[in-house]
From Swiss-Prot:
The lineage of its organism: Bacteria, Bacillati, Cyanobacteriota, Cyanophyceae, Synechococcales. SMART domains: HhH1 (SM00278). The gene is ruvA. It is found in: Cytoplasm. One of its GO terms (molecular function) is four-way junction DNA binding. The keyword Cytoplasm applies. Residues 1-67 are annotated as: Domain I. This is Holliday junction branch migration complex subunit RuvA.
Length: 205
């Protein structure tokens, strides 16, 4: 099973409500469907990494990609609910930001859930009922601070990459910072940028 891809985006396309990219990786081109905000964030002829969920059927193989691991994992939770397929899962993530969606599921905010295309009241009720307990820990702290389940802005990662840091070490630094409660001098992107650079520089040989 494919769980992660890193490669150059060769082509971007929209077919109806589907946001598609062609990723060149190891001499192979992979068609991957993204949520709209991720599709807007990527550019052709640039290297990106995607967390992948693979769906295999008798006559088809589909890849769904996410820039953030937390969103890929939430997508997997969503499509485990009876009656919720991959397109409905993507619609939910398109309609709501990650934390807003988790909060809506935990608090049974049916109005928010029904904003997603193709999600009616009964499906929203079933989603909230089945996922509430599993996702409660994700919103245990609802303060303004970031927590490790919040997706980090792609532009922060991109900025660090332009400074010469590798993606894997950036994500490791972000995870370590989350475990430390975040930067000590603020919670804006500049604070996270400074803290990541300091942390990664201190671990250089």
């Amino acid at each position: 099973m494919i769980g992660w891809l890193k490669g150059d985006v060769q082509h971007r396309d929209q077919k109806g409500s589907r946001n598609l990219v062609l990723i060149a990786c190891g001499g192979v081109g992979y068609d991957v469907q993204l949520i709209e905000r991720d599709w807007q964030a990527v550019s052709t002829d640039q290297r990106h990494e995607f967390w992948i969920h693979q769906v295999v059927s008798a006559d088809n193989l589909q890849l769904f990609g996410f820039l953030q691991l937390a969103e890929r994992d939430l997508f997997r939770e969503l499509i485990q609910v009876s009656g919720v397929g991959p397109q409905a899962g993507l619609a939910l993530l398109n309609a709501c930001a990650y934390k807003e969606l988790v909060t809506a599921l935990v608090h049974s905010d049916l109005k928010t859930l029904c904003r997603a295309k193709g999600v009616g009241k009964r499906t929203a009720e079933r989603l909230a009922l089945e996922l509430r307990t599993r996702l409660t820990d994700s919103v245990a702290s609802t303060g303004p601070e970031r927590n490790q389940l919040d997706p980090v802005a792609p532009d922060l990662i991109a900025t660090l990459e332009t400074l010469g840091f590798e993606t894997h070490e950036i994500r490791d630094a972000l995870q370590r910072l989350n475990g430390m409660g975040g930067p000590q001098d603020g919670d804006d992107d500049d604070a996270w940028l400074r803290a990541c650079i300091k942390l990664m520089s201190s671990t250089d040989p």
